[in-house]
């Protein structure tokens, strides 16, 4: 999982 500032909300399962 990549804790990107934009994707964290989407990818943080």
Curated annotation (Swiss-Prot):
Glycosylated. It is found in: Cytoplasm, Cytosol; Endoplasmic reticulum; Microsome; Secreted, Extracellular space, Apoplast. GO terms for biological process: cell wall organization. Its main location: cytoplasm. Oligomer (believed to be a pentamer but probably hexamer). Belongs to the germin family. This is Germin GS2. It comes from Hordeum vulgare (Barley). The lineage of its organism: Eukaryota, Viridiplantae, Streptophyta, Embryophyta, Tracheophyta.
